[in-house]
């Protein structure tokens, strides 16, 4: 390394620049703890419609939750309390 190379800024390759930007985006998303998808209320409503075709059910008896376990794992949990009697 010559003395001029030491003081001259080194050019970044497009690959290293893209990698750096991607790392920033990933870190930002991790810090935000991505909220649940926007379609969850509609999904719950659709599930209620399907269940109500077969069983009289109160909307409070259906619980739909979404959580992130890891960076690449998300869990959608559906709990339905069914009544003893059918329609």
UniProtKB/Swiss-Prot annotation:
<dbReference type="InterPro" id="IPR005527">
    <property type="entry name" value="MinE"/>
</dbReference>
<dbReference type="GO" id="GO:0032955">
    <property type="term" value="P:regulation of division septum assembly"/>
</dbReference>
<comment type="similarity">
    <text>Belongs to the MinE family.</text>
</comment>
<protein>
    <recommendedName>
        <fullName>Cell division topological specificity factor</fullName>
    </recommendedName>
</protein>
<comment type="function">
    <text>Prevents the cell division inhibition by proteins MinC and MinD at internal division sites while permitting inhibition at polar sites. This ensures cell division at the proper site by restricting the formation of a division septum at the midpoint of the long axis of the cell.</text>
</comment>
<keyword id="KW-0131">Cell cycle</keyword>
<dbReference type="Pfam" id="PF03776">
    <property type="entry name" value="MinE"/>
</dbReference>
<keyword id="KW-0132">Cell division</keyword>
<dbReference type="GO" id="GO:0051301">
    <property type="term" value="P:cell division"/>
</dbReference>
<dbReference type="InterPro" id="IPR036707">
    <property type="entry name" value="MinE_sf"/>
</dbReference>
